[in-house]
């Protein structure tokens, strides 16, 4: 009886190990080629470092300002380790202030070949002022030193920020939000939410972009060019 029980336990253990191996293989297969390349280059997966941060890559869908899918295989958000440490700090501070909220990342490290696809889509249009030209070295996303981000509930529902993320217009600017409220282009609550987002991101060490409430850089372009490398 004991021998049969021992054999049964052994078989169950083998089946468990086999199922775990299959799951590991499937997980590796699901990870995109771009994700593996970013990891090899030393960039870190945001969700692996801090699972409490929500991720929804907007360029993995067509509902972005370009109107097309730019990330064919990338589903995960990556950052330079220094930027990731700053983001983790910002998330922790947000949790201190508002335990019911979380940061939600819409874009992070962006390979330069994706930047080229984006530029080709908008060049010679009114939108090209919002996109860094790869011929000029690209932008901070191309160093893994920038995030497009918002606030959300613990379920992932985004808060009112006045405009959709990726909205190209003056209502997305952060330097005249009081006027935007007076003109009823954004609500007082949206202004409050933007201010909270900037507060926690600045605490983490990020620099807001004047024309996009959702965009934050970890360092200046000059610093990035001097000390960091572009993601090909």
Predicted regions mapped to residue ranges:
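Conserved metal-phosphate-binding beta-hairpin within the catalytic cores
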Residues: 216
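Bacterial N-terminal signal peptides
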Residues: 11-21
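Bacterial N-terminal signal peptides that target proteins for export
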Residues: 2-13
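Short, well-ordered surface patches within globular domains
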Residues: 114
